[in-house]
Amino acid sequence: MEAKYITLTKENIEKEHICCAFSDKKCKDSYELKKTWLKNEFENGYVFRRLDERAKVFIEYGPAEKAWVPVNAPNYLMINCFWVSGKYKGCGHGKALLQSAVEDAKAQGRDGLVTVVGTSKFHFMGDAKWLLRQGFETIEKLPYGFSLLALKINSAAPDPSFNGTVSSGECEEKEGVVVYLSLIHISEPTRPISIS
C-alpha cells in the first residue's frame, strides 16, 4: 500500500493534527497557537505536509524571504521542521517528503532548498548527515554548533548565507533599547523596534 501524504490548509487544519504535540496534553495551548500561526503563514506560501497517520512524520517549509531564521537565501525555500520518528523511520517517508519539497521549489522557479541544522546532532533540528546524503551541501558553519545547508536546483544561483548579525552577535541598531517582538498575528518575520 502506497503511503498517503496530506498538505494542511486553512480549510482542513482544524480537523487535522500537526504532529508536534498530540502526545502531550500539557501542550494544548501551544498546539492551538501553532495552528493559528500556521493559518496565517499559509497565506505567505508556507507548507505543512505530513503522513496521513497519527504519527510524527512531516515537513514544514516556506519562502526563505519570509522565514523566521537569520539567513539570506533569496529565491530558496526554507525547511523549518522535518521529522520522521519511531517505526516510520527507514520506510522512505523522509525521501518522499523531501522530494515533494523539491518538486514545489521547481514548480515555483526557486533556486533550491535551504535549512539550518546542528553541526552535531541536536534533537530539535534536522539530521545533517541524512540531508547531506540526500545531496545537500554545507554552505556555512558557525563556531557554536549550527550549519547552513542547501540543496541547489539552479547550480548558478548565489549561495545562501547566515545574516552578518549571526556571526558578529550584534544587532544593527546601536542606540537606545532594541526590543524584538513576536506576536502570533504577525505574518511577517520579526523586526527590531528601536526605542531611543
What do these predicted ranges mean?
Residues 1-54:
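Short amphipathic alpha-helix that is part of the acyltransferase structural core
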Residues 54-65, 78, 83:
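Conserved beta-strand in the GNAT
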Residues 66-79, 89, 173:
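A conserved beta-turn-beta hairpin within the catalytic core of GNAT-like acetyltransferases
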Residues 84, 90-105:
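Conserved acetyl-CoA-binding loop-helix of GNAT-fold acetyltransferases
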Residues 105-120:
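Conserved GNAT acetyl-CoA-binding A-motif
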Residues 119-141:
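Conserved active-site alpha-helix within GNAT-family acetyltransferase domains
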Residues 143-166:
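C-terminal "cap" of GNAT-fold acetyltransferases
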Residues 185-195:
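Single conserved hydrophobic/aromatic residue that forms the stacking wall/gate
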